[in-house]
């Protein structure tokens, strides 16, 4: 499913989408769509997994789920990541992300 330039797929009842993280930003926020994924600015530096934790916490808040339901499938040490949201389908995630895109 494509929403505002972001591809969200569904695998085994979980939504999966890509993102590009921009660490060391002035504030943490979703800043729109980027190359088929979500662009997100993070205050945290990419040290000791801090930026990954902040990324999961931000999306947990936006999607109204526990951060334990978010998993970084790929890109833990990269700016380009693939995120899985357990318990939410692609359509639900699309509706919740739409205001930020």
From Swiss-Prot:
Pfam families: DUF167 (PF02594)
GO CC terms in record: cytoplasm
Domain of life: Bacteria
Spans traversing the lipid bilayer: none
The family this protein is said to belong to: Belongs to the UPF0235 family.
Protein's name in the database: UPF0235 protein Cpha266_2081
Species the sequence originates in: Chlorobium phaeobacteroides (strain DSM 266 / SMG 266 / 2430)
């Amino acid at each position: 499913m494509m929403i505002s330039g972001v591809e969200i797929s569904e695998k085994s009842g979980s939504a999966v989408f890509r993102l590009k993280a921009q660490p060391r930003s002035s504030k943490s926020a979703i800043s729109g769509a980027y190359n088929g994924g979500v662009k997100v600015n993070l205050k945290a530096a990419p040290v000791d997994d801090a930026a990954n934790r902040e990324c999961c916490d931000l999306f947990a808040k936006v999607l109204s789920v526990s951060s334990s339901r978010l998993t970084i499938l790929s890109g833990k040490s990269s700016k380009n990541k693939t995120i899985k949201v357990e318990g939410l389908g692609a359509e639900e995630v699309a509706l919740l992300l739409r205001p930020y895109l």
